[in-house]
Amino acid sequence: MTPLIRKLLGMNWVLVGTALALCIAGVVAVYSASAFRTEEYWHKQAIWVIAGIVVFVVTSLIDYRWVKWAALPLFLASILLVMLTYTRLGEEHGGAKCWLRIPGVGTFQPSQMAVITGVLTVGLFLSQFRKLHPMLKLVFTGVIVGGPMLLILKQPDFGMTLVWIPVLLSMLMLNGLPKRYLICMLIIGLGIMAPLLVQFGLKDYQKKRIVAFVDPEVDPLGSAWAINQSLIAIGSGGFAGKGFMATGTQVEQGFIPGTTVHTDYIYTAIGEQFGFIGGVVLISTFAVLLLACLFSAHQAADELGLLITVGITAQIFFHVYQNIGMTIALMPITGLPLPLISYGGTFLVMVMFGLGLINSVWVHRKALP
């Protein structure tokens, strides 16, 4: 049996199966949420799924230890791309200048690349300097991620800035950082970031979203409109939902903003059409995917593989929690997409790249002859 065949057969097939199932569900969900509009988003989403699968397979088969020499250059390149969004090349959508226009391809969101390459860089640093004093670990980790975090916050993309928090906490904790340092880091970080966010990082519409989250009745026809309509839509889905592509739904009638129903509010469309059952099936599938990722982390051959796997898993978990949470008023609206489900090529490919790395950690958990 050749090494290639052995790698293919030795993949984490629970991870592969759940990721593929979510990708297919994503195309169906995007179709059902946008088919009554002129834009054929599901066609583009299907193309990105194919591209993501190719990236996943290639990344899975290559030994993940290539990040030892490529992580930092890729991270620096992603920071440069984020900086380019501040130039004429940057493109604004929904009040945030987060995208670059690539001729013939479409838009590209560099912050998505910055997070995943940041995970690789921090993982490499922590694995190489495990015995470094905890305070120095915090300082150097802050130096690594501080620049891109501020750049992303200034765009402003509050959601992508928040993603760094669970990612860094999980990686530092597994690297052996004492809990007292983590608690101090959280307190100091919140003490510094909170006033900066209010004064410089958040635009008026983002502040109104937070107010609407605290009190949905404060502006029911304005900033709280979307979340209130999302709750109505999901609630009206009941136990079994109104049915696939059902007529007369909140989504079809345009009560959910047409620019976000296939992205930020994709779970709303799923909840209305497929009800409580559909929501539970989707969340359960994500749970299986995340457990498969954690099992790969448990079987990692070295600390680099462990840290990469846990960091990417934390990123995916936070996206799932935040996206679904904001549609049912458990979290404020931030615009974070639902992994593999929401429309968007950059994020889908980056998630598949991350899952490919996790699968590579599993495949190469033992030295192959």
Language model segments and positions:
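N-terminal membrane topogenic signal
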Residues: M1-L20
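Hydrophobic alpha-helical transmembrane segments of multi-pass inner membrane proteins, especially
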Residues: V16-N228, T268-I328, F353-L357
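A juxtamembrane structural motif centered on a specific transmembrane helix
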Residues: M1-T2, V30, H319-P369
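Helix-boundary and loop/linker segments of multi-pass membrane transporters
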Residues: K7-L9, L138, G254-P257, A300-A301
